[in-house]
């Protein structure tokens, strides 16, 4: 069905001026007059893909914003669907047609599936997630909420909280500080309490948010949650956006349907509004109870986004500030570090006295495990965000979007490269019987000849949605079969030799967390209801051996299960571990 708003405005020819994004940091401090009336357009969850309905709707919205009396345009994230380089460049071009000052933060759709490891956003918008903007006596502090390169709850990086404190300390006298975060500051953030306490300590009383696609006031531990609606709206709802009018001590929230007059939905005091304080807050998560069962090895000032690898007593991992660290757990000190320009997402590999890591800034690197001296470096054309596997003196790993390769561990020489088209191969590949099996964010699971890189077969689940791709799965191989659980919430079994689909089962809602017993007889997977199930790998059809409720409730964090000495270890989205 044709959208009447698209048909009405489709023939409009817009000649619009380009305006670059606002700088990522506030400027010099000084006296400012008391906060004045500030009229803003608040766009969030616009979800633009070239050629989709939102693409047309957003062009109309930009024209309306340009014709309005708004002083400032604010974007609350989820500008795209998959966060691809193509989508980001396209939506940035549309945003640049605004003739008003504007700034944006990323949403989870820019950070969870980013093929560039979140580097394209920084390149286009001038910051990696933190942005400060001043307007008429207001200081807006925007920051990213993740999750980063995997399905998980949101989290504000420690370095971003430190940035918030520095920016707030530099606020001009009389300036009112407003927070902007794509995620609501509630139970959907793993460190929500730390975030709200930080904001309150620097005088923030209101936070703009999106993510939920609807206009609903919220109480973020005493901070007023000011919502923005999605551009497309719910089924049967007119497309539109949000207008926020700040009046020094209050904000008026208006809904603006495309082509129609705005409608006032709420008026909220910016401090201690009774209607906000009367709303319930999400309960705080229980305090950790691992006393006596857990030992802190190292506390990092940045967010750890990789898995851990051990070279004997040396722990190796990467963080969100691009530091690859080697930490001696016995002596309790750092041995060495190498800092890359962007965050690290690949779990390091320790083998043959080498530490190997891929970089979101591009390239695969090998370092001497003892000294940190670079041994070799293989350039790539795009970000490396996937995990690798070693076997027989070779490394198998994604070489950026659309390709995977085999690398000689000693020299760093590329032995073969297979180009499959597009999408990152993010999950760790599996190797058996001379066959390399991996998934990609292009809807397909691939099987290659490990010796030559020749394609033997590929499979997809029949869905046209990239969101259901097996891009972050770790295939498990046992008895000549391949077992996977992808975001389509189905357990799938394929024949390793031919790629023939043997069976699929959706009796339980499953996600990417899987494991395999040491003898290969049991395949483990975590359900979205917080259960751990085991199935018989030798059975001709799905045969469940047992299912244990972990007591976690709703669960979707993708973290491979770890099996050792007959015990399965599995982690949850709230930082809990079960065995």
Regions found by a protein language model. Give the residues of each.
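N-terminal active-site segment of His-dependent metallophosphoesterases
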Residues: 5, 23-89
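Extended active-site neighborhood of metal-dependent phosphoesterases/phosphodiesterases
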Residues: 85-173, 194-206, 216-228, 234-247
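Binuclear metal-dependent phosphoesterase catalytic core
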Residues: 133, 223-286
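Extracytoplasmic beta-rich repeat domains
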Residues: 288-309, 336-349, 376-391, 400, ...
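Structural signature of WD-repeat beta-propellers
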Residues: 319-320, 359-360, 399-400, 440-441, ...
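Short loop/turn segments that connect beta-strands within beta-propeller blades
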Residues: 328-332, 368-372, 408-412, 449-453, ...
